Amino acid sequence: MRAWIFFLLCLAGRALAAPQQTEVAEEIVEEETVVEETGVPVGANPVQVEMGEFEDGAEETVEEVVADNPCQNHHCKHGKVCELDESNTPMCVCQDPTSCPAPIGEFEKVCSNDNKTFDSSCHFFATKCTLEGTKKGHKLHLDYIGPCKYIAPCLDSELTEFPLRMRDWLKNVLVTLYERDEGNNLLTEKQKLRVKKIHENEKRLEAGDHPVELLARDFEKNYNMYIFPVHWQFGQLDQHPIDGYLSHTELAPLRAPLIPMEHCTTRFFETCDLDNDKYIALEEWAGCFGIKEQDINKDLVI
């Protein structure tokens, strides 16, 4: 499913087709404690762009491996790998960048916020790990997916167009997930009920490369169709922790793939943070997309 979501993000290049330039932003990747995969439906997060790991084999085999290798279920953050100390206790250590798999194409490259291209995200995070505890390491973040390129400034006129395309894209992603959901658990039952109303509405603007004037008119005419998609995306991003606020880290999975296609991405999210506290609350997020204050409802974040 995560591969399917990556495909949707690629399609966003057309739906969100503005000049292919962007500004520098930040991403901080937190180390995750060892946690096994929970029962969250695969694909519940529409902005995860990494491929999941697939384990084949019977339970007995897995149990034997775990017993022989304590690192089996010890998860480390990006840039680190598990090794055993003298007492056979698993620990996370920085990965040697040279041990990263060789890239197979340009699409694997990433750009850091100091405008340096890395062969892959593995190479970037392994390098960042070696700089832990230094000023340079603290400031170094993954900016966007793809090799570094010239990023033009986002003009005020362009900034006003960004939420028009983004709103339409969010709605279309939800509708697509709904159409592909049969037997795939892409959406929860509550989400399906909400999206069903959008899907069956004959007034819904079909996905396509529409002029911003049409997108603006559609938002005005069919405003109610956009309320849930905006809330839904906030809920997909607000994961670590689930606290009603989006950090730079939580925004990164959405931001990084969009920046090469939408050069106003960084500035848009910066303007959403009205109180400049480095976090975007639900009220700020919804307001950025034109949702009226009386229609902002935490119960819609499902």
From Swiss-Prot:
The keyword Signal applies. Residues 260-295 form the EF-hand domain. N-glycosylated. Keywords: Basement membrane, Calcium, Copper, Disulfide bond, Extracellular matrix, Glycoprotein, Metal-binding, Secreted, Signal. It comes from the Eukaryota. One of its GO terms (cellular component) is basement membrane. One of its GO terms (molecular function) is extracellular matrix binding. It holds the Pfam family SPARC_Ca_bdg. Glycans are attached at residue 115. Gene3D superfamilies: 3.30.60.30, EF-hand (1.10.238.10). Coiled coil: none annotated. Residues 88-150 form the Kazal-like domain. SUPFAM superfamilies: EF-hand, EGF/Laminin, Kazal-type serine protease inhibitors. Disulfide bonds join 71-82, 76-92, 94-129, 100-122, 111-148, 154-264, 272-288. Residues 70-92 form the Follistatin-like domain. PROSITE patterns: EF_HAND_1, KAZAL_2, OSTEONECTIN_1, OSTEONECTIN_2. Its main location: secreted. GO terms for biological process: bone development; cellular response to growth factor stimulus; pigmentation; regulation of cell population proliferation. Residues 1-17 form the signal peptide. InterPro entries: EF-hand-dom_pair (IPR011992), EF_Hand_1_Ca_BS (IPR018247), Fol_N (IPR003645), Follistatin/Osteonectin_EGF (IPR015369), Kazal_dom (IPR002350), Kazal_dom_sf (IPR036058), Osteonectin_CS (IPR001999), SPARC/Testican_Ca-bd-dom (IPR019577). Ca(2+) binds at residues 273, 275, 277, 279, 284. It is found in: Secreted, Extracellular space, Extracellular matrix, Basement membrane. Belongs to the SPARC family. Appears to regulate cell growth through interactions with the extracellular matrix and cytokines. Binds calcium and copper, several types of collagen, albumin, thrombospondin, PDGF and cell membranes. There are two calcium binding sites; an acidic domain that binds 5 to 8 Ca(2+) with a low affinity and an EF-hand loop that binds a Ca(2+) ion with a high affinity. This is SPARC. The gene is Sparc.
